[in-house]
Amino acid sequence: MSNIIKQIEDEQLKQDLPTFAPGDTVVVQVKVKEGDRERLQAFEGVVIAKRNRGLHSAFTVRKISNGEGVERAFQTHSPVVDSITVKRRGLVRRAKLYYLRERSGKSARIKEKLVRKSS
């Protein structure tokens, strides 16, 4: 029975997702339905948490909008999430960055991870 469930879940997984981790700045394109039309809305912020559970994977993105912190949780393989783009890689030493909730301004900055190019 569990093999059938696993097979159905594997069919619904998105294959075109980029690899991202907590600390990365991402742009999530979300499908928003307004009346009878549908449009894409961008949500850009720092990934503060990631949960890897196959089809039930999720991640939380935090941004500052008009001086107010806004967090939004997304299901990774949801049809509502159109695309995920990584803008910046962050250098952090934690899996969950909940401490950023209490910080603002310069203390909430995250160092950028520099990727070495192999020659």
From Swiss-Prot:
Homology family: Belongs to the bacterial ribosomal protein bL19 family.
GO MF annotations, alphabetized: structural constituent of ribosome
Phylogenetic classification of the source organism: Bacteria, Pseudomonadati, Pseudomonadota, Gammaproteobacteria, Vibrionales
Residues annotated as transmembrane: none
Protein's UniProt name: Large ribosomal subunit protein bL19
Record-annotated disulphide pairs: none
UniProt function note: This protein is located at the 30S-50S ribosomal subunit interface and may play a role in the structure and function of the aminoacyl-tRNA binding site.
PROSITE patterns reported for this sequence: RIBOSOMAL_L19
Stored HAMAP family: Ribosomal_bL19 (MF_00402)
One cellular component term from this protein's GO annotations in UniProt: cytosolic large ribosomal subunit
Pfam families in the cross-refs: Ribosomal_L19 (PF01245)
One GO process term, biological-process aspect: translation
Gene3D superfamilies membership: 2.30.30.790
InterPro entries hit by this protein: Ribosomal_bL19, Ribosomal_bL19_CS, Ribosomal_bL19_sf, Translation_prot_SH3-like_sf
Domain of life: Bacteria
Keywords, ordered alphabetically: Ribonucleoprotein, Ribosomal protein
UniProt source species: Photobacterium profundum (strain SS9)
